[in-house]
């Protein structure tokens, strides 16, 4: 699972000439659902070649490989950089910008679940239960991040209106390794405005909170 889930990011090692091309190519074809569907049967076949005793589990291998690949792209979609999931039909980078690219609050519950599964391998039911708990906690964190992003977006919109700031585009994303403090960048006719907002502010935001 770890190896398959890492495959889409191996495109960073392709020699494309310069950093701009490298950045544009990353999270493109290698992260597109269509190409993942094409690659899945081949990868499942290779796994069964390596583990011939599991040939009778063909459907499970195909499902496992496809889930490992697709969830990789979906997770990348939660970051600010966007992922071209729908190539070759659309090159629009899909991104919800709700989680920083490195966030231990998401990663640690998953690691806890994996470690628990191995530690309690003599008690498989307990290991599986703890693994599911870790996965559930990390998934709830992603759901929370989407809610926090929506809330901050509404706060930013009100604050912009209160300050009579007109923006053509707004970028809202969490600061490193948390989903509490958010950074806001807005594009105006004369330049940019920037600010921060914390979800721990329970009172109604005043104009000085951002901008």
Q: What are these model-derived regions, one by one?
A:
Residues 1-154, 158-174:
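N-terminal membrane-targeting hydrophobic helices
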Residues 202-211:
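Single conserved hydrophobic/aromatic residue that forms the stacking wall/gate
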Residues 168-196:
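Exposed beta-strand-loop-beta-strand "reactive/processing" segments of non-cytosolic proteins
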Residues 92-93, 179, 210-211:
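A broad, structure-centric signal for solvent-exposed, well-ordered loop/edge residues
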Residues 197-201:
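Short, solvent-exposed aromatic-acidic interface loops
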Residues 41, 191, 210-211:
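Generic hydrophobic alpha-helical segments
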């Amino acid at each position: 699972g770890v190896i398959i889930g890492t495959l889409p990011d191996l495109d960073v090692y392709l020699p494309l000439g310069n950093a701009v091309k490298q950045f544009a190519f990353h999270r493109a074809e290698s992260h597109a659902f269509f190409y993942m569907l094409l690659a899945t049967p081949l990868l499942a076949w290779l796994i069964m070649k390596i583990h011939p005793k599991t040939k009778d589990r063909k459907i499970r291998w195909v499902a496992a490989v496809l889930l490992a690949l697709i969830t990789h792209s979906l997770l990348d979609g939660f970051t600010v950089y966007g992922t071209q999931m729908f190539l070759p039909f659309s090159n629009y980078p899909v991104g919800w910008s709700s989680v920083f690219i490195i966030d231990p609050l998401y990663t640690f519950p998953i690691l806890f679940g994996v470690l628990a599964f191995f530690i309690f391998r003599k008690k498989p039911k307990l290991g599986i239960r703890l693994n599911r708990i870790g996965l559930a906690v990390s998934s709830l964190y992603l759901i929370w991040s989407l809610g926090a992003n929506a809330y901050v977006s509404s706060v930013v919109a009100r604050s912009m209106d209160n300050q009579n700031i007109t923006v053509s585009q707004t970028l809202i994303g969490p600061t490193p390794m948390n989903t509490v403090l958010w950074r806001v960048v807005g594009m105006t006719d004369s330049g940019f405005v920037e600010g921060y907002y914390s979800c721990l502010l329970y009172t109604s935001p005043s104009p000085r909170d951002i901008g």
